[in-house]
Amino acid sequence: MKIFDYDDVQLIPEMCIVNSRKECETTATLGKHTFKLPVVPANMATIINEELAEKLARNDYFYIMHRFNVDQLKFIKNMKDKNLITSISLGVKPDEYKLVDQMVQQNLIPDYITIDIAHGHALSVKNMISYIREKMKDQVFIIAGNVTTPKAVRDLELWGADATKIEIGPGKVCITKLKTGFGTGGWQLSALKYCAKTASKPIIADGGLRVHGDIAKSIRMGASFCMIVSLFAAHLESPGKEVEINNCIYKEYYGSASEYNKSEKRYVEGKKELIKIRGSIFDTLKEMTEDLQSSISYAGGKDLQAIKRVDYVLLGDYKD
């Protein structure tokens, strides 16, 4: 199969039909809710916290709260009390089965649950999906991942997932491919394409996006949403620790499988990086919106569907 990544692809424009890029609609629907953009900040401890999740929800952006040292029940109740969408992450450990029971018992069923482990094509994920479905029926939208193959996508959908996350290891602070030899680093976009061809439910591109134009490329290859890490790191609202170097303020961010997040040096597959503080995340979201509107105008349409229909070229050499 042809292997390529974001830098290897350029989209080919169609005739523009709008008078202004502002006419282009960037909204995207996932489950029962529609959001301003088809993007979501990564569910990592240095990317999102309770306060930022609330701000995003109030402004009609999708979020997924991370699962590390968070009182999930308190978080869900707080968001429900404020009439905001509830979106959390779960792993597959025994305590998280108990948490599912507690959610049901306390009538705190969230709108979205993301089952979030490094290798999502696993029996442990199948068992968790089955348990959530048994307890919560169709009251919750289940996102599961992460996976990289069409077979994995088919299995997750068959097991009951409503959407799947695609990637292993292309993120800037992920070192899975270096530690294990496995991953989609260097061919993430083609992995997305081949998985999307098989999928009958939404696909979420997770990681490897470095610039705003990569959102349009992901949509062209079949993504319904894009989970983004580095582009959403180091903002004023970001929970990462501030570090001063040579009179410049940086914020740190690290992978969920890093020793900094796990607080132990076992099965480490992530690292830490510093990024100079960028300003408000809502300024970035505004710029991202404008850039995506431009992408839609180049695609010859008025909404995201136009991007899915454009042709593209592969640049230079690629592996076949």
UniProtKB/Swiss-Prot annotation:
It catalyses: IMP + NH4(+) + NADP(+) = GMP + NADPH + 2 H(+). It is an enzyme of class 1 (oxidoreductase). Belongs to the IMPDH/GMPR family. GuaC type 2 subfamily. It comes from Mycoplasma mycoides subsp. mycoides SC (strain CCUG 32753 / NCTC 10114 / PG1). One of its GO terms (molecular function) is GMP reductase activity. The keyword Oxidoreductase applies. NCBIfam families: GMP_reduct_2, PRK05458.1. The active site is at 174 (thioimidate intermediate). InterPro entries: Aldolase_TIM, GMP_reductase, GuaC_type_2, IMP_DH_GMPRt. GO terms for biological process: purine nucleotide metabolic process. GO terms for cellular component: cytosol; GMP reductase complex. It holds the Pfam family IMPDH. Its EC number is 1.7.1.7. The keyword NADP applies. Keywords: NADP, Oxidoreductase. Catalyzes the irreversible NADPH-dependent deamination of GMP to IMP. It functions in the conversion of nucleobase, nucleoside and nucleotide derivatives of G to A nucleotides, and in maintaining the intracellular balance of A and G nucleotides. NADP(+) binds at residues 203-226. It comes from the Bacteria. This is GMP reductase.
